[in-house]
Amino acid sequence: MRLFVALAPPADVLTDVDAALGPAREVQPDLRWIPVERWHLTLAFYGEVPDESLTGVIEMVARKLSRRPLPGPVELSFSGSGQFSRRALWVGVAGDVDRLRALAKSVNTDRRPYRPHLTVARLRGGQDATRAAEVLSSYAGPVWRAREVHLVRSFLGPHPRYETVSSWPVTGPAPES
């Protein structure tokens, strides 16, 4: 099974991003636009994991999160846009990005630097999403609080879908004043 750890932004925030994509979809309708119900903010990608290892992965994520709880809420917003190597069009993340990186680092097994983003479209064979990225470059969405971290299973195929396997609160106790 394919597993990843992610945040699920609130529905109203995703609706705002979706509305902002309208002009980008008009200038580049040929991109493979990802449906809103599959949008998430990936923290760590574990890839293929044997079914019998699921309990161990759940325990590992829980242990890692408990070792590095973030005090107080993590406030984020989506802002700007870009593309990754002609593979994906993304909307950027603003706000408590350093804390988001710390959260990602706590569950990540990959050594590459974490680049927070919301993938909104995939590109086919060398496509360039520059026009769509330019349209979205000035986007600044509403602020939202990350409340839960989710371990998610992805099912590939003609109709990909996601299933939340387990969830944990993002934060530890709020700091005392």
Predicted features by range, described:
Residues M1-S177:
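Histidine-dependent nucleotide/RNA phosphoesterase domain, centered on the 2H-phosphoesterase fold
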